[in-house]
From Swiss-Prot:
Gene name as annotated: dinI
Gene3D superfamilies, alphabetized: DinI-like (3.30.910.10)
GO process terms (BP): DNA repair; SOS response
Keywords per UniProt: DNA damage, DNA repair, SOS response
Record-given protein name: DNA damage-inducible protein I
Amino acid sequence: MRVEVTIDKTRPLPAGAIEALTGELGKRVNRQFPDAVVHVRYAGANGLSVLGGAKTDRDLIEEILQETWESADEWFSAE
């Protein structure tokens, strides 16, 4: 399974945030889907693509992404 998260490039994140999000989201997704590969990048709009998974897998990954984003204060430091 491949998971791709796109972040709107007109709303840049702090330095190191893309790498940190990739790592943290990857850890959380791999707990449920050990074969998943996670990519996070800038693009024209925010988005989520899940390739090679069922509809229920996408729903679960959306929940994981939401939890990861909301807990950013716990795992990301812009210093």
